Regions:
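A short linear-motif detector with a strong N-terminal bias
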Residues: 3, 21-23, 45-47, 66-71
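N-terminal positively charged helical leader segments and presequences
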Residues: 30-59, 64
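Amphipathic coiled-coil/heptad-repeat helices and related helical stalk/stem segments
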Residues: 26-27, 52, 72
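Short, flexible micro-motifs
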Residues: 29, 40, 80, 84
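Ribosome large-subunit tunnel/peptidyl-transferase-proximal elements
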Residues: 1-38
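Short basic, glycine-rich beta-strand/loop surfaces that mediate nucleic-acid
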Residues: 58-93
């Protein structure tokens, strides 16, 4: 991540919500979904381990998959409807 401006703005809201959308949660599941196709948007948490998020961000850039940073793992986990943090998640079709 280059600057704070790269953090997802949550569409003018202070929260991110994926309810009603098909979501893949977690780095392993996300990598599998990226290989299989059908990923619409990838999100990664700024406070997640760069060893996890770095390769995901690079894959997205190399394969023209939309990518955005989220402020924290807790925010991303809540958006996905889980009670724990998530390093990465994706909206899928």
């Amino acid at each position: 991540m280059d600057t704070q401006n790269d953090i997802l703005a949550y569409n003018g809201k202070n929260s991110l919500d994926f309810s009603g959308r098909r979501v893949v949660v977690g780095a392993k599941q996300l990598k599998k979904a990226l290989r299989n196709g059908g990923v619409l948007q990838v999100y990664a948490a700024c406070n997640a381990d760069p060893a996890i998020t770095g390769p995901i961000e690079a894959y997205c850039k190399d394969h023209s998959v939309a990518f955005a940073w989220v402020k924290s793992m807790a925010d991303l986990g809540r958006a996905c409807g889980i009670e724990v943090g998530a390093a990465a998640a994706a909206l899928v079709d």
